[in-house]
Amino acid sequence: MNYPRSKKYCTPALLQKIMGPNPVKLEEELLLHHRIPQNAVVCDLGSGQGLTSVFLAKEYGFTVYAADLWSDPEENRAFFRAQGLTDAEIIPVKADATALPFEREFFDGVVSTDSYNYFGRDPAYLDEKLLPFVKKGGYIY
C-alpha cells in the first residue's frame, strides 16, 4: 500500500515519538475508507506523545482530543503548537480510557491506533465505557 499522507511524517524528529510500529501508517490504513466528516470532534484514544493526533488534525481536518493516561498534556501541547496547530484544533487530555472525563455523546468519532488492546480487553468496555461518549451515528476506528 502507498501511504501518501503518512510519508510527510517520516522525519527523524517525528519518528522519535514512535514507540512501536509506525502508528501514522497504521492510522492512514485504518482510515482509508472512513466516514467521519471533516470538522468532526474526534477522540484520539491512547494518543501517546501525540503524533497520531497531529495526523488526525492536519490530514483529516478533525478537532482532536488527544487522550492518554501516560503522556504529559503540557509536553503534548508544546509539540502540537510546534507542529502549527492551535489549542482549538487539538486538545491534550490526561485521561484513563476506563473513566473518560467527557460529556455523554461528545464525540463524532473515536480513533484508537495501536492502543485499544490495553484497555478494551474487558468484554463490557465498549458498551459501558466508550460508546456512551460517541454521538448516535458516530464512528469508532
Label for each model-derived stretch:
Residues 98-110:
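A short acidic, Gly/Pro-enriched loop at the edge of an enzyme's catalytic core
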Residues 124-139:
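A short glycine-rich, Lys/Arg-flanked "PGG" loop and its adjoining helix->strand segment in the class I
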